[in-house]
Regions:
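Structured catalytic-domain cores with a bias toward divalent-metal coordination
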Residues: 1-279
């Protein structure tokens, strides 16, 4: 396979705090020699584990980018042991456009793994994550929310996996994140997902859904920031004690947990998110 066309402007082995870009050449009508410039930050202090923290996998989900851009600005290298790689907006073209998918190639990044160094813009970005960034990390956190089309109770999720020891490590990280809701989830459409790529490499991987409706609230951003800190403490990278509060544990073990309409029409909500309902 050919080398990735994506080039990083930061040195992944250098101690200290660095801010830079993942630079991907992209010739288009407005710039013959243009590039997609994806912000990336890294903080490193000696030897230790590596965490890869990502947001903006879908461009209309804002809690991750807000929390990670803030962390990149405020993190102190003296407070960590190891390395933290931050990519606040993985699909940066989609993030700039406020769209779920890329305006360049309509690529859904979370259905484009493992990517292709000779493919579309989205496939070239996912290939760089697959072959360069994911192999650097033992711990992976991908922050999502509902975007413009969904609304969620704020939860952190770990997946049901064939490797039960890996599943247990992921579940422990999910509980450490300490969102208001903690979910064990069996993905029913996992082909091409970032999640699947990370888990296939044996990583400790967790993800979130922190609201939606195409916006971010002060509360969901607070949940993201607190959860990131707790995750890094749990990974043994960040100093300090976790900030914990009660979390409701949920389980989505199979396809019965998904109910879709088979017809068009007007939807009237009878209950709000989080309300208890009876079967039948």
């Amino acid at each position: 396979m050919k080398p990735s066309p994506v080039k990083s402007t930061i040195d992944f082995e250098q101690d200290g705090l660095q801010h830079g870009f993942l630079k991907l050449p992209h010739s288009h009508d407005e710039s013959a020699y243009g590039s997609v410039m994806i912000p990336i930050s890294m903080v490193k202090n000696g030897e230790g584990p590596t965490a890869l923290l990502t947001g903006g996998n879908h461009g209309d989900e804002y809690e991750g980018p807000i929390a990670l851009f803030d962390l990149a600005r405020t993190i102190d290298p003296r407070q960590i042991r190891g390395r933290v790689i931050l990519v606040p907006a993985m699909n940066y073209p989609a993030f700039q456009a406020g769209k779920r998918t890329s305006p360049i190639d309509s690529g859904n990044m979370n259905r484009s793994f493992p990517g292709n160094p000779e493919g579309s813009i989205t496939e070239k970005i996912t290939d760089y994550f697959q072959r360069t960034l994911l192999p650097l990390a033992e711990w992976v956190l991908d922050l999502h929310s509902g975007g413009k089309t969904l609304d969620f109770l704020p939860f952190c999720a770990a997946h049901r996996l064939e490797d039960k020891q890996q599943e247990q490590r992921c579940a422990e990280a999910m509980r450490a994140f300490n969102a208001p809701y903690s979910m064990m989830l069996l993905e029913i459409d996992s082909v091409g997902m970032y999640d699947t790529a990370a888990e296939a490499m044996g990583k400790v991987f967790i993800t979130t859904e922190l609201g939606g409706k195409g916006t971010a609230t002060a509360e969901t951003v607070r949940i993201a920031k607190r959860g990131i800190r707790n995750f890094l403490i749990h990974a043994g990278i960040l100093e300090g004690s976790p900030e914990l509060s009660p979390s409701i544990h949920l389980d989505m073990p199979d396809q019965r947990c998904y109910i879709g309409s088979e017809s068009n029409g007007l939807l009237e909500m009878k209950v709000n998110l989080g309300e208890k309902v009876l079967e039948g």
